[in-house]
Amino acid sequence: MVKRNFFSFFFILLIPAAGMAQDWPQAFTIELEEVTYTEWPALQSAAAASHNGRWFLLGGRTGGLHGLFPPNTFPLDEANQAIHMLDPQTGAFWSRSVYELPDSIAVPLRATNAAHVHIGDYLYIMGGYGQDMDDSSMVTFNTLIAVDLAGLEPAMESEADIQPYFRMLRDSVFYQCGAEAEVMYHDGQPLVYLIGGHTFTGEYTQIGLGFEQHYRNNMQLFSIEDDGATLAITAPVTMEDSLLYHRRDFNVAPIISKTAANGEALVALSGVFQYDANLPWLNSFEIFKDADDSVRAVMAEMEHRFNNYTCPVMVMYDSLLQRNHLLLFGGISQFVYNTATASVVEDLNVPFTADISVVTRIDSAVDATTAYTQDLLPVRFEGLYGSNAAYFPAPDFPKYSNGVLKLPEARTPLLAGYLFGGIDPEIPNFGPSTATNTLYEVWLTYTAPIASLSDAAAEDVRIYPNPAQDFISVFVPGEGKVLLEWVNVVGETVQTETVFSGMAATIAVPDAAGVYLLQITDMAGAQRVLKKILVY
C-alpha cells in the first residue's frame, strides 16, 4: 500500500520573517511528494547505499530518540538487527537477519551512528555504537565491514547465503561513532575522509556519569584496498584540530569548487557539542585539496543556525551563477521558525524541527573568493521530519562525478532524489518518538533568476575585445538573465542573445562589419546599458 501526499516548496515567497529567503533570486523550486510504502520497515541512523536501483540499509535503530536516563537508554530490541533491501519503484523489500553472519560481523552491524561510504559496488561501514558481543555493555566498535552490494542483491532476492558478501577488519582508525565519512578522488583514486566523531563506552545518560567519552578531534585520510577477497587500508594521514573536528552527528556533503585543485571540495556543517555548552556548533568548514596536493580545512564565514544535527542533504550546483545550494531537510535545530509570531526564535533545548534551510556557497565571478549564506525556505514539513533520515539521489538526474546535481539541467521538473525514514517525534522537546518509514520524492525545477541592472553603471560592463572580429566576451555585473541586442547604424536590431550576468559570456558578433550599439537590458525592461562596438 502506498500513502501519497503532495506539496511544493517555491523558493521565493514574501514572508516577512528574519532568516527567510524572501529577498533571494529564485533559482529553483522544490516539490515533495510523499510516496510511503506502509509495509516498509521503520528505520533511523542506518548506513545506506543505492545500487542498481535498490536501496540497502544496515545498522541504525528501529525505535525513536534514545533514552536520556538509565537503565537501557539504547535497548537492544530497538537496534536494527536486519539487513534491508528496498525497491523504491515497486515497493518490494527484502530483509535478512544479521545473525545469518558470524558474530564478529553481526554484532557491529547492530550498531547505530556508524560512518559509511559507498565506493563502486561496495558499502563500507565504519565503527558505530551498540551492545557488545555478550550484550552486557555498550561499546564503540573499531570495525570496517565491506558489503558487496552486487553480490548481496541477488542473494537477498533468491534467499541464498549472504555470508560471502560480508568481510570485516579491525583497526583503531574506525574506533568512533558519530563521525562523518566522504570520498574525494586524488589522481583518480578514491580517498576516504573520516571526520570528527567520538568514542563512547558505557550506557548513555544525560547526567554525564557512568561512561567514558572522548572526542577524536581529528580527520583521518586513507584509501581502502579491496580486491574482493583481501580487505586492507593504507596508512592513514591524521589531521588534528581541536575546533574544526571536535564535533559529531553533523552533515558532510560534496560541492563543486573553483578554488580547489581538483574542482571539488567537502563542506562539514554544524554538529555537536561545544566545549562549554550542550549546544550545536554554529559554524561550518570546507575541506579541499591545494595545487601542491596537500589537504586543507578552512572555516566558512557563515553562522549556521538551522538544521544542526544529521539530516538529509541534497547538493546542487548552478554552473551559470556559480553557486552550490545545499538543502537541509528538517532534523534538530537551535533556531526554529515560530509560525505564531512569523519569526525565527532560539530554543536552547535544541528541538526537533519542521524547517528546511538552504546553505548557498557563492563563487565570485571575478576572483577566487567565496561567500556562504543560510536561509530558511518559506515552506516547512507538515510534521517534525528529517532527523537521521536517509537521502538517496535519483539515478537518472544529471550529476557531476562527485554526485552533486547539475541544477541547470532541470529546466522541467525532474525527480532529484528521495528522503526515507528517520525519527518521528510527537512534539519538539522531551516527548515520545518512534522511527518512521516515511518516504518522499524530491522534484526539482531550475528557474533562472531575473537580473536587475539598476545599480550597474555603464563602466561596470566589460567587453573584450573591441574592435572585434568573430566573438566578444561580455561581463555584466549582478545576477540573473539579461538581454543583449545588436543595433546597427540605422536603428535595426540585427541579432539578440540572452546571457547570465555575474559571469563572463562569449557570444558571436554580427556577420556584417560595421559600428553597432550593444544594448544590454534586464529582463524586466527597467534598465538599459549601451556600448559601442566596432566589428571588422
Place the predicted regions along the sequence by residue.
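Beta-propeller domains
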Residues: 23-36, 47-100, 132-140, 148-157, ...
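Blade-edge beta-strand/turn elements of extracellular beta-propeller
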Residues: 23-36, 91-104, 150-172, 224-243, ...
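Beta-propeller and closely related beta-sheet repeat lectin domains
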Residues: 44-47, 110-116, 177-182, 248-253, ...
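Residue-level signature of beta-propeller blades and closely related beta-rich strand-turn architectures
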Residues: 61-63, 129-131, 198-200, 272, ...
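Asp-box/WD-like beta-propeller blade repeats and closely related beta-sheet repeat scaffolds
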Residues: 109-113, 131-185
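C-terminal outer-membrane/trafficking sorting elements
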Residues: 455-464, 468-536
